[in-house]
Amino acid sequence: MAPTLATAHRRRWWMACTAVLENLLFSAVLLGWGSLLIMLKSEGFYSYLCTEPENVTNGTVGGTAEPGHEEVSWMNGWLSCQAQDEMLNLAFTVGSFLLSAITLPLGIVMDKYGPRKLRLLGSACFAVSCLLIAYGASKPNALSVLIFIALALNGFGGMCMTFTSLTLPNMFGDLRSTFIALMIGSYASSAVTFPGIKLIYDAGVSFIVVLVVWAGCSGLVFLNCFFNWPLEPFPGPEDMDYSVKIKFSWLGFDHKITGKQFYKQVTTVGRRLSVGSSMRSAKEQVALQEGHKLCLSTVDLEVKCQPDAAVAPSFMHSVFSPILLLSLVTMCVTQLRLIFYMGAMNNILKFLVSGDQKTVGLYTSIFGVLQLLCLLTAPVIGYIMDWRLKECEDASEEPEEKDANQGEKKKKKRDRQIQKITNAMRAFAFTNLLLVGFGVTCLIPNLPLQILSFILHTIVRGFIHSAVGGLYAAVYPSTQFGSLTGLQSLISALFALLQQPLFLAMMGPLQGDPLWVNVGLLLLSLLGFCLPLYLICYRRQLERQLQQRQEDDKLFLKINGSSNQEAFV
């Protein structure tokens, strides 16, 4: 039996804490591809694509034939070669594509039906993916193709859990961007999961046993969702103020309630307690003819409940807004830069160390451990996105009816919308500076310096998703958050498919040297500064509009003696 929204709100801290842990262990684990790749090679996936040259024996590691022949090596008794790398990288491309692209239909479904069913489906798909990899490892020569299906289900299931967890911050009010960043930080840190599994694997535990146990743990996610997540979507702070201490059962609708339903119910009750219908209807007609709002309490509730259609932009209007379009450019460039590095990291390291597999394995483990930085760094962007918003909220909550002299002496407060845009501009500018720094370190063929590249890669990956999520939550209606985030993820995932031809170009014509690919990606990453530059211009536009409104209010006050333009006389 699914709990009510009121029950879910009481359990919000438990749900948030478990969601962070579940994201860490079961969401975007494919981001730890470097460690999984080593284990798949050691288990013989697509090893049959490699042919052993005559001058290579079983004891040779990294042995090469004559210059005209392909380089091969042995890993745990299985052959490893370039053809195997290309096929497994293609499987990673498919899985990482679904990890992002599936968010559009997920967002549409979640906005309409809520996160519960999607989270149940995601945990089940993740468990099936683990079992498929384990089954493929039992007969790799015949069942290697299962890795494509398994990684596809892994990406789909992981994104279901990640995406549904992004609705939980709606229950935390002004801290919503911070909690979104925390969820995204745990999602980004899930890249540490496969390095952790690799440590268990290196300790001698069977690969199949590890995956079966992991699939069983995914069942716990299913049970947690079944008993704690409600059927209805979580209403945003603008739709429901959870801080109001009221028992919904007093009003008779504790079972299913959203912000709009609450106001509708209160309006209905208000009508019954109001003045006679004949008196109210006459005033309504006069007000509608003259274009004014009514001050009657019951009608005022209804009037204030209806402007959502006028205030909230349509979905298509949001899609073609400059902020969304420029955020797509930023995400496409950043996603391609990050995904290419994750997919090609082992080969890049192998090029730097001339094929030393032990050193490659060591640096891959270091990269995996550093993914935990996302849990610490991602909330920083969320904090930047929430910077001083509480002061703006306090300003809007002050009583409106004050003397003119008191109004002039009152301390000037920040405009909430302008503060949101300012925070987003700072977040994206800082993130893109780090992305450019990451591109510069990738150009330097120095092995110890790659640790700095690992750190910058991890920080940027956590920052960019947190910044985009916080921007969408701040600028667009909560009912469009899932669809817009899904659209952004789909387009950036399609663009990130270019990482496969870039990988083939690096391994083929460039003979494993990533220099020119990194140069091109560095130049492309400069496009990410378009969004913060536009946000600067947009902020100035909002400031001019605010100044004009303030001047109009002063003029109205001077003429009428009151700043209330909604009074009906």
Swiss-Prot record:
Where is it made, tissue-wise? Detected in several tissues with higher expression in placenta, kidney and peripheral blood leukocytes. In the kidney, is detected in epithelial cells of the distal tubule and collecting duct. In the intestine, is expressed mainly in crypt cells of the intestinal microvilli and epithelial cells in the base of the villus.
Disulfide bridges in this chain = none
Region span, Disordered: 395-416
Outcome after substituting residue 274 to A: Increases affinity for phenylalanine. Increases phenylalanine transport activity. Strongly decreases glycosylation. Strongly decreases expression. Increases membrane localization
On this chain, the residues bearing Phosphoserine are: 274, 278, 297
**Membrane-topology annotation of the record:** Multi-pass membrane protein
Instruction: Please tell me, according to the UniProt entry, what happens when changing residue 278 to E.
Output: Slightly decreases phenylalanine transport
Report the subcellular localization: Cell membrane; Basolateral cell membrane
- Entry-linked InterPro entries: MFS, MFS_trans_sf
Segments spanning the bilayer are 20-40, 90-110, 120-140, 143-163, 177-197, 203-223, 323-345, 365-385, 435-455, 462-482, 490-510, 516-536
Activity modulation notes:
Affinity and transport activity are regulated by a phosphorylation switch state at Ser-274 and Ser-297; increasing of affinity and amino acid transport activity via dephosphorylation at Ser-274 and phosphorylation at Ser-297.
Q: Which residues are glycosylated?
A: 55, 58, 560
Name of the protein: Large neutral amino acids transporter small subunit 4
Q: Which organism is it from?
A: Homo sapiens (Human)
UniProt gene name: SLC43A2
